C-alpha cells in the first residue's frame, strides 16, 4: 500500500521523506493557501523532495480553464498528477487528459456511483473522502469496499486513494478493504508509529541497557 502525505508544508514533507516511508504527496488549494506562497513554486519544491506522484489541483471549474491549468502544471515536473473535482466538467477534463497520457486524481468522491464515473473517464486515482463520509453518519469504509468491488468486477485500473484519513484505524480499515493508497496529514502519519506497548517496551529496554557494557 502506498502512503501519501496530504500537506503543502515543506518541513513536514522533508521530515517524513527522510524516513523513506512517503510514496507521494497530495495537495489542494486550501492547503497551499495556508502556506501563503505562490502555488506553482510550492508544487515545484514538493516535486524536488518527493520522487513519487504529487497531486496538484486545478483551480478552474470549467473545461477550458481546467485544461489550460493542467497543461501548465504538468510542465512543472514529470511527477505531477492533475487533481480535478468530481463534477461533469472535471470528468470531461479527465477524459481529455487521459488521451494525452497525463495522470489524474479525481477528488471529492463521496459515493460509489461517482467513483464508477471517474473510472469510466479514465482517472488514474479516485479519492474517496473517508473521514467526511463518516461525519455524515454513513460508513466511509463501506464506500471503499463498494468501490473496490465495482472496480474488480469490471477490470478498471483506477487506483483507490483513500483520503480524509484521520488516524491508524482509518488506514488499517482502508488497507483491509483494498484501497491501493492512502493520504493523510502529517499529524495522522505520526500516529501510525505510536502504540502504548511500544512505549512501555522501549522504556524497559532503555532501563536495562544501562546495565550493559558496550
From Swiss-Prot:
Belongs to the transaldolase family. Type 3B subfamily. GO terms for molecular function: aldehyde-lyase activity; transaldolase activity. Pathway: Carbohydrate degradation; pentose phosphate pathway; D-glyceraldehyde 3-phosphate and beta-D-fructose 6-phosphate from D-ribose 5-phosphate and D-xylulose 5-phosphate (non-oxidative stage): step 2/3. Keywords: Cytoplasm, Pentose shunt, Schiff base, Transferase. Transmembrane segments: none annotated. This is Probable transaldolase. It is an enzyme of class 2 (transferase). Its EC number is 2.2.1.2. PROSITE patterns: TRANSALDOLASE_1.
